Amino acid sequence: VILHGDGTREYKVIGALAEAVKAQSSDPAHWNRLKEIFTSKSLQMVSFTITEKGYALQKADGTWFPFVEADIKNGPDKATGAMAVLVAMLYERYKAGRYPIALVSMDNCSQNGAKLRESVLTMTEEWKKVGFVDEGFVNYVSDEKIVAFPWTMIDKITPRPSEQIAADLENLGIENMQPVITSKKTYIAPF
């Protein structure tokens, strides 16, 4: 919905989702499709919104989380955690042509790109230690001219959704447009 200064409105449907793929090595069809996507030279960016905890590989005492320990032991073909799945896909990309890519954390935490990079490099190094990947792959992932980890800042300050716009959209035949009140008493809407 575009609100013009003269009070008129313009409506456009913006479709940003083309496909959904499970990032599970236990599902061969989805896993192979994910590999196909990651090995495509046209893929330029992968974004993440997995919360700061999604990048964590170790508990507070410095030991690996059990799923991370399993990922290190089992390697790229049986990756389960988010960072292991990402590194497994980067390994496929490396083998396919060492194509550049930007890995963009959109999580609202300080130095989000650095946190993502640290986790990716840690998993990469651990897999190198046990022989799943080679030094060339470590160099590929470490070179920020090829695999970039930019820092981002997310601004979620948005105006309260208009109930009138929701009604107008529903009158146009678009369903479920009413704003929702969250547990934190903020308002969100699908428009």
Model-derived regions, located:
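Substrate/ligand-engaging "lid" and interaction regions
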Residues: 1-191
